[in-house]
């Protein structure tokens, strides 16, 4: 979704700038192409800059008991965008087996650091409580967002905490 918005915005700005520059010759056709790529990269950088600014507004020392829907939504759409940019091909089967009328616990075995991003995006409509290692809560941009989305911190090295 976000990728399509960025592409549409970049295309609209490219067309507008090309129209204002009055590009009419075929030998100048490279200008809109370079403009489109530059504007697209600029829009993505602007998005992450805004995300960074929003992360500064979150009090990481405070304990939250309910996740904020806005910040949880930002986490989900950013995960979607990262999955799309990584060109991750995901085939999901068995979603109908996930219970909808009772509480349950899912334990994911992941081989890479990217797997939880995809898993969280795929199960975004489920009312899940996510767990994460304590070092993820200290990450500069993602840390405040996962804290405000009420992820649980579990130290895997300490058996008593796990």
Would you name each region that the model predicts?
Residues 2-14, 18, 22-103:
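Membrane-anchoring hydrophobic helices of lipid-metabolizing enzymes
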Residues 84-162:
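Soluble catalytic domains of membrane acyltransferases
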């Amino acid at each position: 979704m976000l990728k399509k918005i960025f592409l549409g915005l970049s295309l609209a700005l490219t067309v507008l700038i090309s129209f204002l520059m009055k590009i009419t010759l075929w030998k100048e056709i490279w200008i809109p192409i370079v403009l489109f790529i530059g504007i697209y990269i600029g829009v993505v950088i602007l998005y992450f800059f805004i995300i960074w600014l929003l992360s500064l507004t979150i009090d990481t020392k405070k304990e939250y008991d309910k996740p904020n829907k806005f910040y949880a939504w930002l986490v989900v759409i950013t995960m979607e965008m990262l999955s799309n940019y990584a060109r991750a091909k995901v085939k999901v089967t068995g979603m109908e087996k996930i219970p909808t009328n009772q509480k349950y616990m899912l334990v994911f075995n992941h081989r890479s650091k990217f797997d939880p991003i995809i898993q969280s995006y795929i199960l975004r409509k489920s009312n899940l409580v996510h767990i994460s290692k304590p070092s993820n809560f200290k990450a500069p941009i993602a840390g405040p967002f996962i804290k405000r989305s009420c992820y649980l911190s579990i130290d895997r090295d300490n058996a008593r905490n796990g």
